Amino acid sequence: MIVIHSVAQMQQYARERRGDIALVPTMGYLHEGHASLMVEARKRAKYVVASIFVNPTQFGINEDLDSYPRDLEHDKEIAAKAGVDVIFAPTAADMYPDRYQSYLNVEEITVHLCGASRPGHFRGVTTVVAKLFNIVAPKVAFFGKKDFQQLAVIRRMVRDFNFDIEIVGMPIVREKDGLAMSSRNTKLSPAEREKALCLSRSIAAAKAAFRGGERSVAALQKVAAAVIEAENSPLIDYLEFRDQDSLLPLDKADERTLLALAVRVGSVRLIDNSILGED
């Protein structure tokens, strides 16, 4: 495995291997969830590139850009074990050179859920992912379903801009106690870590009510919110039941309905989701 920092060098590597590269875009501080994407990518292409870049344009004012965990040596170990050929770890100056002025924006599906409380976030996401697609030229790219809205946005961007790239969404990987794996989990104190379990428990409660016959979204929201509110300190950013394709709100739930939530535990904002009809 090699590490490439230069955009020009990454482009040269890609030109020599065009047509058989799988890309796993990440912000680093890798965990088993990231590794699952890399292992699957290994099955789908001759060469696997994992990008590690904490993208400044997707962080807003007073968000955790400076404190976002970083550990390239740790990341190299995980990537190598997962079968990655190249870590592409560019600098912000290389990705966004002086007087950078070009951004890509996907409308409508970016304005609600995470987009409502993080204005500009998805503009940064789509811009950096489009740049990575152009630099690495993959035939397939892997994203985790924990960031369900992000996955939907990327798929829309790929369709609308005619990127000849297959987008693969991979299942959420969870800790043994149900907490969705996230690089931000490391920022939780032990007490906060325990409180954070309310996200997966609220999903479980809503799904149990759904299996019991409840179809009213308003009623299901009350069931899920009650689990989080019982913990006192976690603050709900959003708790929504949406159509999984359009991400539009619903009044009645069915087996394809997406339950998506974002909750702030202490200073850490966590997200999770599940499809009601799936285990």
UniProtKB/Swiss-Prot annotation:
Reaction(s) the record says it catalyses: (R)-pantoate + beta-alanine + ATP = (R)-pantothenate + AMP + diphosphate + H(+)
Nucleotide-binding as UniProt keyword: yes
Subcellular location: Cytoplasm
Keywords for the protein's UniProt record, in alphabetical order: ATP-binding, Cytoplasm, Ligase, Nucleotide-binding, Pantothenate biosynthesis
Binding site for beta-alanine: Q58
Residues that, per the record, bind (R)-pantoate: Q58, Q150
Main subcellular location of this protein, as a coarse class: cytoplasm
UniProt-listed GO biological process terms: pantothenate biosynthetic process
Gene Ontology molecular-function annotations: ATP binding; pantoate-beta-alanine ligase activity
GO annotation, cellular component aspect: cytosol
Pathway assignment: Cofactor biosynthesis; (R)-pantothenate biosynthesis; (R)-pantothenate from (R)-pantoate and beta-alanine: step 1/1
InterPro entries referenced in this protein's UniProt entry, alphabetically: Pantoate_ligase (IPR003721), Pantoate_ligase_C (IPR042176), Rossmann-like_a/b/a_fold (IPR014729)
Gene3D superfamilies: HUPs (3.40.50.620), Pantoate-beta-alanine ligase, C-terminal domain (3.30.1300.10)
CDD domains found in the cross-reference section: PanC
Superkingdom, natural source: Bacteria
A Pfam family recorded for this sequence: Pantoate_ligase
Active site per database record: H34
Classification via SUPFAM superfamilies: Nucleotidylyl transferase (SSF52374)
Catalytic activity, EC: 6.3.2.1
HAMAP family per UniProt: PanC
UniProt function note: Catalyzes the condensation of pantoate with beta-alanine in an ATP-dependent reaction via a pantoyl-adenylate intermediate.
Subunit text: Homodimer.
PANTHER family: CYTIDYLATE KINASE/PANTOATE-BETA-ALANINE LIGASE, PANTOATE--BETA-ALANINE LIGASE
Protein known as: Pantothenate synthetase
Organism: Geobacter sp. (strain M21)
